[in-house]
Amino acid sequence: MPATGERGWRKLILALLAFVFLPELPQLRAILPVEQTIYLLVPALAACFLVGWWAGGRALVAIAWVSLAAWLMWERPGTPEAFHNLERGWSLLLAGAFGLTCLLGERRPLFARALGALSIAIFLAIAMSVTGPVPLSAAKETIASEFVHRNDETMAGINGVIGDHPKEWNDVTSRFPTFATMPAEIEKQLTTLSRVGLTVFPSLLSLESLIALALAWTIYHRLSRARLGAPLRPLREFRFNDQLVWGLMVGLTIVLLPTLQAFRGVGRNLLVFFYALYAIRGLGVLVWFLAPSAMAMTVGVGLVMLFSGFLWIQLFALAGFLIFLFASFVLGLGDTWADWRRRVRPTA
């Protein structure tokens, strides 16, 4: 019988749909490392079912998921070969490392296993880059080309719609002259986002990978009776080892010290990664004290505004999100020492 924390599909399906479809939005395509997140999710699920087979699960189900992952990883005509190879390689490294940490760390919580798998995958990726045929510089060029390719696709779609409906577009721009510059503004925005995405690619890839592992873990425990560990806890209970604050401190030190300028890229990525982790922890604190429905509605409205296509609305929403994320980060970082959730939760 499923554990209490493993019942229900509604929230899981919403999270899964967001993980699969939100990266298809133009602005997110321009900055996120993995656009087709199914490449991260399915191999991780296959790893879970393989470990589940070892723990007494059904062999046929494990073979089916491994076959699906193998089919997904198979190179197909029409895919950008260089970036697709990097994407597949990372997915397989991550899934293999996660399976290993699940086998060897039976008593560890999910986040510790996922973080361990991420560390192993990063170490192996760097080692393969140093000793293999694809150095880091070549990988960076491949990633930059992929971002350019995505942005070109987006702009081709926008310009194609405008070209197919010239009369309607002329009517709109005559009534609202500011719309005439919208395609150029969107292209400029996408280019800026891609520059940022290239700079912090490792940290964003790490965050996407952690989300994929969390989803794979949750889906597995909905579908299988062979337990691999405790269920994923709600966001309001999310916390991690307080010693991880040193990762944030190391990143800040590298960025601020002039003598470590050669490692500034590493420092930026450490800051982005741990900033995001502490912001999520802060969101957990907020959800602990506030109504989850109000939080979800606020975030939903903000996302609609952020991707509305109107520059001034987007800027307003972006400013609001940055303030909200900073407040969440401060709460999450403060939770390291204050442990807000040990305080009495308000009943009103």
Which residue stretches match the model-derived regions?
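N-terminal signal-anchor module of multipass membrane proteins
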Residues: 1-53
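Alpha-helical transmembrane segments
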Residues: 7-22, 61-71, 246-252
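Central hydrophobic cores of alpha-helical transmembrane segments
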Residues: 61-70, 113-123, 296-308
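Short helix-perturbing small/polar motifs within transmembrane alpha-helices
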Residues: 73-79, 88-129
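Membrane-interface interhelical loops and short interface/amphipathic helices
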Residues: 130-196
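Selected alpha-helical membrane-embedding segments in polytopic membrane proteins
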Residues: 174-233
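Small-residue-rich helix-loop
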Residues: 227-282, 288
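Extracellular/periplasmic helix-loop-helix junctions in multi-pass membrane proteins
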Residues: 258-271, 288-332
